[in-house]
UniProtKB/Swiss-Prot annotation:
One of its GO terms (cellular component) is cytosol. It holds the Pfam family Hydrolase_3. Phosphate binds at residues 10, 43-44, 200, 226. This is Pyridoxal phosphate phosphatase YbhA. The active site is at 9 (nucleophile). Belongs to the HAD-like hydrolase superfamily. CbbY/CbbZ/Gph/YieH family. Its cofactor is Mg(2+); Mn(2+); Co(2+); Zn(2+). PANTHER family: PHOSPHOSERINE PHOSPHATASE (PTHR10000), PYRIDOXAL PHOSPHATE PHOSPHATASE YBHA (PTHR10000:SF58). Keywords: Hydrolase, Magnesium, Metal-binding. NCBIfam families: Cof-subfamily, HAD-SF-IIB, PRK10530.1. Mg(2+) binds at residues 9, 11, 223.
């Protein structure tokens, strides 16, 4: 029997703007599982910031985190495979951040750390406070990102935001050119920086093929630039209606936005 897979981005796709799951999506995905589909979350988030959604969907598959940087097993509470950022690259990036006066949120081991409480940090921290303590991601303010980068086991990625968007775009290109790191936009005002070569599509393909399955039988849902790699790698790439036109152009199908029952409708109409 052919095993079919549904790969799901979270923010801007499966989640509403209020960071909640639509009841219709939960129900449709449960029906898809009953019909034999494997569900997997493929996100730019740290694994500590996925708990409520993973549990609500009652998943048993690993999660692809930080734009494909690592594969995390929630039940064993362990990283299965990873390509973290080399420490020397992290230190060079931190030096560049300081030179350009850009604040970064650094994703490490089991936490997200920062020096200054920027808009992105405050926004995500406020969301975290709405969760039960056992589901709350760990945010830690540190005196030095550089010192922390040398003390942890792994640096997964950096998330950067800045009031001056053109400056942030220029900085991202500068980092790619100078350090050979991967820069992907995960939100309209946020660029994620990770080890060169990491992507959602690459990690998803590796996981699917390791199970002996085919990417032709994968349906991937996404909305942003960091989703393009998996939308193109999947047999069917589905872009949300709220996606940028450049993302929609790389998908096979475009559905409604993330405030509607479009994911559920697609599942019922095309998959089960």
């Amino acid at each position: 029997m052919t095993t079919r897979v549904i790969a799901l981005d979270l923010d801007g796709t499966l989640l509403t703007p209020k960071k909640t799951l639509l009841p219709s999506s939960i129900e449709a995905l449960a029906r898809a599982r009953e019909a034999g589909y494997q569900l997997i979350i493929v996100t730019g988030r740290h694994h500590v910031a996925i708990h409520p959604f993973y549990q609500a969907l009652a998943l048993d598959t690993p999660a692809i985190c930080c734009n494909g940087t690592y594969l995390y097993d929630y039940h064993a509470k362990t990283v299965l495979e990873a390509d973290p950022m080399p420490v020397i690259k992290a230190l060079q990036l931190i030096e560049m951040l300081n030179e350009h006066h850009i604040h970064g949120l650094m994703y490490v081991d089991d936490a997200m750390v920062y020096e200054h409480p920027t808009g992105h940090v405050i926004r995500t921290s406020n969301w975290a406070q709405t969760l039960p303590p056992e589901q709350r991601p760990t945010f830690t303010q540190v005196a030095s990102l550089a010192e922390t980068a040398q003390q942890v086991n792994a640096v997964w990625k950096f998330a950067l935001t800045h009031d001056d968007l053109p400056q942030l775009q220029h900085f991202g290109k500068h980092v790619e050119h100078e350090l050979g790191l991967e820069c992907e936009w995960s939100w309209h005002d946020q660029v994620d920086i990770a080890r060169g070569g990491n992507s959602k599509g690459k990690r998803l393909t590796k996981w699917v093929e390791a199970q002996g399955w085919s990417m032709e039988n994968v349906v991937a849902f996404g909305d942003n630039f960091n989703d393009i790699s998996m939308l193109e790698a999947a047999g069917t790439g589905v872009a949300m209606g709220n996606a940028d036109d450049a993302v929609k152009a790389r998908a096979n199908i475009v559905i409604g936005d993330n405030t509607t029952d479009s994911i559920a409708q697609f599942i019922y109409s095309h998959l089960i």
